[in-house]
Amino acid sequence: MECFQVFEAGEGIERAILRGLSARGGLRGRCANGGHPALLVVSPRAAARGTRLPRQCRTVLLPGGMGGVPPRAASAVSYGASPRDSLTISSREEGALWAALQRELVTVEGQVVERQEFSLPLAPGEEELPLLACAGALLLLGIPPEELGQALS
């Protein structure tokens, strides 16, 4: 039984999620039941490589336009540059990426996060999509949008 599982190809997403969670005292509450992760996070490179994924989870966070067969999930949240994605890039400025939550989402604990924009710290040379994946995972794990910048810095 796991709260979340990350499928990645060296992007550092799981490490960033764990660092962000530890800054807030770790995970709280029930996360999974039935032996499946409450949250499955798929990185851009893992999706591009066609990484084999578990058959099911409660919520899946995946790159928009991901090919193949996604896991069976009660909820799917996409991230990427397309306006059709749930979590998108709104704009960029020096040292920051503005992300837009295009539709409300429900965290693994059942809290609703409303549509909004928020700033994320973007280090020089850092890739944008893995940063969006980290932000999306932290949102789904209960980190409020206004605390994401601090959790990811």
Segments predicted by a language model, with ranges:
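Adenine nucleotide phosphate-binding catalytic loops in nucleotide-utilizing enzymes
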Residues: A81-S153
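Fold-independent oxyanion-binding glycine-rich loops
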Residues: A9-G10, V42-R45, L62-G65, Y79-A81, ...
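Phosphate-binding loop of NTP-binding sites
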Residues: M1-S75
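Short, solvent-exposed linear motifs at loop/edge-of-secondary-structure regions
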Residues: R72-R84
